[in-house]
């Protein structure tokens, strides 16, 4: 089944956002379109932007005036950016970053008032959950590049990414309990990224943790000085982009598939995946290149 079909079935300013340089803006029909139901007026700027270069797509949360709140419009725009050409061999890795001093403050509380109604509230949370599932089930790795606060659903977004790199000035919180809205959906991703007692302390108190604490508990992959954030994130992205897309894609899918299984089932599934990997053109190319003491030439073909 095509990757997009599978995905759909699951129903810091300046250099920190990688928007400068020779990044190729995605087609206007993609970048400027308003996802169905997003509720954004045509005159309003798109809440995310996306550019792609050398197999690396950078998606930027672009509403710093509202602390990059994950409004319904923002979520649908982010979903569109993530799903765009997911099956293309030209796409090797995705980076999600943000403009301004806040990565994301979480849901837009103005959308969660009584006036909006239960159906609208359900759409907000269901759309957010779909975005997180799209990240998990996407055929390429997704990297969060964090410079600043990631709170509530913003913290959920970081926890949902495959890799997360943050500046040492960043912090992470699930503070919904302080305004009477427990961070139940952020808790799903958080509980799968950090130990249970750490997750529950964050959820029960709403108190933030530092980048170093987040690294210690497994929410982050790396913490670097702010000046080195883009360089280190791009180093990781370029390394992934230099590898075989189908091999990496199979590896990602297999990793998450085996994760909830018992030990025996996990080894059975991964053994089958290793056999499938060897049947890939790039699987044989890599081994042949190693034996011939040369660099592999990846085809990036799925068979």
From Swiss-Prot:
UniProt keyword annotations, A-Z: Fatty acid metabolism, Lipid metabolism, Mitochondrion, Transit peptide
Name of the protein: Enoyl-CoA hydratase domain-containing protein 3, mitochondrial
Primary site of residence: mitochondrion
Source organism of this protein record: Homo sapiens
N6-succinyllysine carried by residues: 110
Alphabetical GO biological process terms: fatty acid metabolic process; positive regulation of cellular response to insulin stimulus
Family affiliation: Belongs to the enoyl-CoA hydratase/isomerase family.
Transit peptide, residue positions per record: 1-17
NCBIfam families for this protein: PRK08139.1
Localization, UniProt: Mitochondrion
GO cellular component: mitochondrion
SUPFAM superfamilies: ClpP/crotonase
Molecular functions (GO terms): enoyl-CoA hydratase activity; hydro-lyase activity
Tissue: Expressed in adipocytes. Expressed in blood cells, with higher expression in patients with low coronary lesions.
Database matches in InterPro entries: ClpP/crotonase-like_dom_sf, Enoyl-CoA_hydra/iso, Enoyl-CoA_hydra_C, Mitochondrial_ECH-domain
Function according to Swiss-Prot or TrEMBL: May play a role in fatty acid biosynthesis and insulin sensitivity.
């Amino acid at each position: 089944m095509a990757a997009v079909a599978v995905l759909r079935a699951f129903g810091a300013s300046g250099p920190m956002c990688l928007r400068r340089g020779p990044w190729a803006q995605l087609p206007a029909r993609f970048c400027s379109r308003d996802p169905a139901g997003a509720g954004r007026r045509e005159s309003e700027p798109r809440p995310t932007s996306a550019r792609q270069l050398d197999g690396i797509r950078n998606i930027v949360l672009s509403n710093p005036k509202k602390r990059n709140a994950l409004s319904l419009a923002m979520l649908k725009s982010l979903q569109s950016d993530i799903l765009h050409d997911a099956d293309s061999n030209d796409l090797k890795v995705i980076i999600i970053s943000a403009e301004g001093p806040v990565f994301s403050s979480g849901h837009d509380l103005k959308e969660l008032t009584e006036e909006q109604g239960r159906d609208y509230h359900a759409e907000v949370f269901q759309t957010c959950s779909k975005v997180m599932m799209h990240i998990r089930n996407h055929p390429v790795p997704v990297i969060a590049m964090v410079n600043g606060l990631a709170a509530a659903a913003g913290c959920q977004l970081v926890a949902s990414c495959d890799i997360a790199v943050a500046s040492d000035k960043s912090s992470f919180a699930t503070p919904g309990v302080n305004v009477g809205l427990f961070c139940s959906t952020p808790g799903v991703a958080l509980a799968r990224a950090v130990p249970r007692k750490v997750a529950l302390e964050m959820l029960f108190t709403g108190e933030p943790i530092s980048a170093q604490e987040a690294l210690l508990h497994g929410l982050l992959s790396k913490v670097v000085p702010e000046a080195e954030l883009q360089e280190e994130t791009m180093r990781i992205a370029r390394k992934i982009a230099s590898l075989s897309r189908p091999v990496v894609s199979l590896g990602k899918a297999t990793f998450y598939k085996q994760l909830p299984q018992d030990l025996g089932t996990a080894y059975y599934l991964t053994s089958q995946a290793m056999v499938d990997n060897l049947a890939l053109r790039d699987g044989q190319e890599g081994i042949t290149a190693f034996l011939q003491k040369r660099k592999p030439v990846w085809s990036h073909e799925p068979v």
